[in-house]
Amino acid sequence: MTGKFGITVLGSGSKGNAAVIHGPEGKLLLDAGFSARELENRMEQREIDPDNIQGILITHGHADHIKGCRTFADRHHVPAYLTAPTLKDADRNHFLPERKTVIAPGSAFELCGITVEPFTLPHDAVDTIGYTFRAEQKKIGVATDLGHLNMLARQKLRGCALLMLEANHEPSLLQMSPRPIQLKRRILSRHGHLSNEDSLAALEELLTEDSVSLVLAHLSEECNNRDLLEDMAEKTLKKLSCTFRHARPL
């Protein structure tokens, strides 16, 4: 999507999360959950020049979203944007670069010709946020780590031209997995991760006549099945009267 408002997903899952937001006046990196070298490689594979990134937007301080932030930001001389609690939390793990800008949920700001609005999500990391991006009379919404879709998230994510939403696990596969019971309970909690059913049940409310594309993200390699999710998504989307016709698990 180089040259127009859009998003290129570099990777999404427990091993790392990152995406490039293309704006009218530049590009932003959303999360930096891979090493700096891996981020650069993934960008170059998609014909994105890493030197064109003008800032890094962080959703929360878990390593799979932030571990490459310091090296990439310092190497390319760009700031990281994150909330004050996340800054404090991530600084302890030495994930942050020299240049940092504090942002606040509910307070929109302008970058690269994009109106960026962070909003709070219910997740078990300190001060987790999602984002909406507005430009060219379109809205992109991203929410990839949340235990449930609360009223605020539903309000912010409704009517996106492109929606990137978590579909982390299939509950039956999670329960059969060898994961510790404490981890299973955390994932299933209201501050854990969305299941396939959780995500798909929300689409009737979130997708409107303005919705063009959906990306189902943060799939568990161990506790989800891409073919199953694809089938579930296609069946759900046939019921909806919107322009959306594509589901792409990552």
Where are these regions (language model features)?
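Conserved beta-strand hairpin/beta-sheet module of binuclear metal-dependent hydrolase folds
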Residues: 1-46, 129-144, 162
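Active-site neighborhood of phospho(di)ester-bond hydrolases with catalytic His/Asp-centered motifs
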Residues: 30-33, 53-61, 81-84, 141-144, ...
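Active-site metal-binding motif and surrounding structural segment of the metallo-beta-lactamase
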Residues: 36-82
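Active-site metal-binding loops of divalent metal-dependent hydrolases
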Residues: 11-12, 32-34, 61, 121-124, ...
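Active-site environment of divalent metal-dependent phosphoester hydrolases
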Residues: 62-66, 87-90, 125-126, 148-151, ...
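Cap/insert and terminal regions of metallo-dependent hydrolase folds
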Residues: 151-248
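Metallo-beta-lactamase
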Residues: 83-130, 134-137
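Metal-dependent catalytic neighborhoods of phosphoester/phosphodiester hydrolases
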Residues: 67-76, 89-93, 224-231
